[in-house]
Each structure stands twice: as structure tokens, then as C-alpha cells.
From Swiss-Prot:
Membrane-crossing segments per the record: none
Propeptide: 149-172
Major subcellular site: membrane
Lipid addition sites, GPI-anchor amidated serine: 148
Name assigned to this protein: Ly6/PLAUR domain-containing protein 6B
GO terms assigned for molecular function: acetylcholine receptor regulator activity
Organism: Mus musculus
Length: 172
């Protein structure tokens, strides 16, 4: 009986892990972008997601041109226009200088009922997300690791670890 409970617990855990992967399989994990292995054009080079007037964040990030930012830029800028219902109307992402990052935050236009939120960040491909309010429309300095030898490990979700522990507890 104990062996049967153990096999059942392991099977349920495997099903949960596999189903989690199926749920997220349709989405690209833009956070898991590794630093490029090709030589950089100059010291402290970086890349940003870049797009001009994209309709949504997914397509902006997915089809972003993969090129190094110019040497006179230090940050990634994101400009997000959206309706009062939160629907994106325009997304622009690009490499930016410090001067272009002075005007971060959100501004609501009463005439057109649209909001524009601007954010800047520092680091390799740091502009994954869209600014949507005053808490994330900020100038964020995040020093990304820029080594080509770094490896990204897959860490299971915390709730799966708790679930596994709960299944194994009766067997102990």
C-alpha cells in the first residue's frame, strides 16, 4: 500500500510539472534571453528590445531587431500608449540616452482618453515589460550580468515544490 501511495504521488507530481510546461508553451519567455556570445562592438555594449508603434508587447519583443545599441546610448526606453480600458494602442521600444530618460512616468490625455507611460532601464535586454502605471513607469537601473559563460538554470515553481512536499509527507 505504501509503495502504491508513493507511485501515485510521483505520478501526480509529474503530471503537474508537465501540465505547467504545456500552459506556458505558447508564450516565449523573454526573461530567459541569454547574453550574446558574439563579440561586442565596444566595452559595456548592450541590446534593447526595439520596435516602432507595435500593436502589442508580445509582437514588439518577438520581432525586435537584434542589434547592438549605439555607443552614445546607455539605457532602454519604452513608450506605451493605451486606452482608459488598458488596451495597448502603440508601443515603441528603443536604445536611449540619459536625456531621453528624464521624462519617465505616466501622463493622461483628457482630450483623447489615452495614457502614455514611459520607462527607462539599464542592462542587457531589460525592457521586456510595459509601463502601465506610476509604480512601473520609472527609471530603473538594473545591472545585468554580461558574461558569455553564464548559464541559466531552470528552477521549478515554488508551488510545485510545496505540492511535492505535501505528497511526500504522508510517506515519511
Amino acid at each position: 500500500m505504501l509503495l502504491l501511495c508513493h507511485i501515485l504521488a510521483v505520478t501526480i507530481l509529474q503530471i503537474l510539472i508537465i501540465s505547467e510546461n504545456w500552459v506556458f508553451a505558447k508564450n516565449i519567455n523573454f526573461y530567459n534571453v541569454r547574453p550574446p556570445l558574439d563579440p561586442t562592438p565596444f566595452p559595456n555594449s548592450f541590446k534593447c528590445f526595439t520596435c516602432e508603434n507595435a500593436g502589442d508587447n508580445y509582437n514588439c519583443n518577438r520581432w525586435a531587431e537584434d542589434k547592438w545599441c549605439p555607443q552614445d546610448t546607455q539605457y532602454c526606453l519604452t513608450v506605451h500608449h493605451f486606452t482608459s480600458h488598458g488596451r495597448s494602442t502603440s508601443i515603441t521600444k528603443k536604445c536611449a540616452s540619459k536625456n531621453e530618460c528624464h521624462f519617465v512616468g505616466c501622463r493622461h490625455s483628457r482630450d483623447s482618453e489615452h495614457t502614455e507611460c514611459r520607462s527607462c532601464c539599464e542592462g542587457m535586454i531589460c525592457n521586456v515589460e510595459l509601463p502601465t502605471n506610476h509604480t512601473n513607469a520609472v527609471f530603473a537601473v538594473m545591472h545585468a550580468q554580461r558574461t558569455s559563460g553564464s548559464s541559466v538554470s531552470s528552477v521549478p515553481s515554488p508551488y510545485l515544490l510545496v505540492l511535492a512536499w505535501l505528497f511526500m509527507l504522508p510517506l515519511l
